[in-house]
Amino acid sequence: MSRLLQFCSSLLRHRVVLFSKPGHSGRLSHSESPQNQVLTPTESVVGIVVFFATFFIPAAYVMSNLKFFKGE
């Protein structure tokens, strides 16, 4: 086993990252199957609020201070 794979497996403990799997052109793959977890409504609401706040708060700041952002 190469040193990189030993290093990765020591970091991830139970997961080994395979860098060059035959038949896959350079894609990263894990040795475990993905865990399917359903999002709760609270997690969905938090995600949506963060998404919209990320875009609308800076836009609202620029719109409220538009006279300072205009080039004169």
Swiss-Prot record:
<keyword id="KW-0809">Transit peptide</keyword>
<feature type="topological domain" description="Mitochondrial intermembrane">
    <location>
        <begin position="65"/>
        <end position="72"/>
    </location>
</feature>
<comment type="subunit">
    <text>Component of the cytochrome c oxidase (complex IV, CIV), a multisubunit enzyme composed of 14 subunits. The complex is composed of a catalytic core of 3 subunits MT-CO1, MT-CO2 and MT-CO3, encoded in the mitochondrial DNA, and 11 supernumerary subunits COX4I, COX5A, COX5B, COX6A, COX6B, COX6C, COX7A, COX7B, COX7C, COX8 and NDUFA4, which are encoded in the nuclear genome.</text>
</comment>
<dbReference type="GO" id="GO:0005743">
    <property type="term" value="C:mitochondrial inner membrane"/>
</dbReference>
<feature type="transit peptide" description="Mitochondrion">
    <location>
        <begin position="1"/>
        <end position="29"/>
    </location>
</feature>
<protein>
    <recommendedName>
        <fullName>Cytochrome c oxidase subunit 8C, mitochondrial</fullName>
    </recommendedName>
</protein>
<dbReference type="InterPro" id="IPR036548">
    <property type="entry name" value="Cyt_c_oxidase_su8_sf"/>
</dbReference>
<dbReference type="GO" id="GO:0005739">
    <property type="term" value="C:mitochondrion"/>
</dbReference>
<feature type="transmembrane region" description="Helical">
    <location>
        <begin position="41"/>
        <end position="64"/>
    </location>
</feature>
<comment type="pathway">
    <text>Energy metabolism; oxidative phosphorylation.</text>
</comment>
<keyword id="KW-0472">Membrane</keyword>
<keyword id="KW-1133">Transmembrane helix</keyword>
<comment type="function">
    <text>Component of the cytochrome c oxidase, the last enzyme in the mitochondrial electron transport chain which drives oxidative phosphorylation. The respiratory chain contains 3 multisubunit complexes succinate dehydrogenase (complex II, CII), ubiquinol-cytochrome c oxidoreductase (cytochrome b-c1 complex, complex III, CIII) and cytochrome c oxidase (complex IV, CIV), that cooperate to transfer electrons derived from NADH and succinate to molecular oxygen, creating an electrochemical gradient over the inner membrane that drives transmembrane transport and the ATP synthase.</text>
</comment>
<comment type="similarity">
    <text>Belongs to the cytochrome c oxidase VIII family.</text>
</comment>
<dbReference type="GO" id="GO:0006123">
    <property type="term" value="P:mitochondrial electron transport, cytochrome c to oxygen"/>
</dbReference>
<dbReference type="Pfam" id="PF02285">
    <property type="entry name" value="COX8"/>
</dbReference>
<dbReference type="InterPro" id="IPR003205">
    <property type="entry name" value="Cyt_c_oxidase_su8"/>
</dbReference>
<keyword id="KW-0812">Transmembrane</keyword>
<feature type="topological domain" description="Mitochondrial matrix">
    <location>
        <begin position="30"/>
        <end position="40"/>
    </location>
</feature>
<keyword id="KW-0999">Mitochondrion inner membrane</keyword>
<dbReference type="GO" id="GO:0045277">
    <property type="term" value="C:respiratory chain complex IV"/>
</dbReference>
<keyword id="KW-0496">Mitochondrion</keyword>
